[in-house]
């Protein structure tokens, strides 16, 4: 079997195609969440704590010297990325919770199977023994 044919069979399996679609949707969803955090959530949060823009939070480790740029640790951007992550994680959690709930509804409990001949016979024997014990 040629490598191209093997790859084609691998790529056309349902799982791989589903995974590719999931990655594409996830990337688009990530952009939406990043915009939500940067443009919708962080500005009012910054206003609530005194008009602060989180992107501006930074610590300069070394000042610029001539042509060498300053070494800066931008922890405000990190805080914003943490918000991004938390929102994405919560959205994924809720989606999985919804999917699990829908799957549980699909899996209706199966009706109890009809008793086998042996079970019916044993039940009759039990009932007869109870009857005999009650007479005694």
From Swiss-Prot:
Keyword Membrane among record annotations: yes
Transmembrane segments: 10-30, 76-96
Subcellular location: Cell inner membrane
Domain of life: Bacteria
Principal subcellular localisation of the protein: membrane
SUPFAM superfamilies, A to Z: Gated mechanosensitive channel
Gene Ontology, cellular component aspect: plasma membrane
One Pfam family cited in the UniProt record for this chain: MscL
Annotated InterPro entries: Mechanosensitive_channel_CS (IPR019823), MS_channel (IPR001185), MSC/AndL (IPR037673), MscL_channel (IPR036019)
Keywords assigned: Cell inner membrane, Cell membrane, Ion channel, Ion transport, Membrane, Transmembrane, Transmembrane helix, Transport
Entry keyword Kinase: no
Gene Ontology terms for molecular function: mechanosensitive monoatomic ion channel activity
Membrane disposition: Multi-pass membrane protein
Classification via PANTHER family: LARGE-CONDUCTANCE MECHANOSENSITIVE CHANNEL, MECHANOSENSITIVE CHANNEL MSCL
Family indicated by similarity: Belongs to the MscL family.
Summary of subunit composition and partner proteins: Homopentamer.
Described purpose of this protein according to its UniProt entry: Channel that opens in response to stretch forces in the membrane lipid bilayer. May participate in the regulation of osmotic pressure changes within the cell.
Name of this chain's protein: Large-conductance mechanosensitive channel
């Amino acid at each position: 079997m040629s490598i191209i044919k093997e790859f084609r069979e691998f790529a056309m399996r349902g799982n791989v195609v589903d995974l590719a679609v999931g990655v594409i949707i996830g990337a688009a969803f990530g952009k939406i969440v990043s915009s939500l955090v940067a443009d919708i959530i962080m500005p009012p949060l910054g206003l609530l704590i005194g008009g602060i823009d989180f992107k501006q939070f930074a610590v300069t480790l070394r000042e610029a010297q001539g042509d060498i740029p300053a070494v800066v640790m931008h922890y405000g951007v990190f805080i914003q990325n943490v918000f991004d992550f938390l929102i994405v994680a919560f959205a994924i959690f809720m989606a999985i919770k919804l999917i699990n709930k829908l799957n549980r509804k699909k899996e209706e409990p199966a009706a109890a199977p009809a008793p086998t001949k042996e079970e019916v016979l044993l039940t009759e024997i039990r009932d007869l023994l109870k009857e005999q014990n009650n007479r005694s």
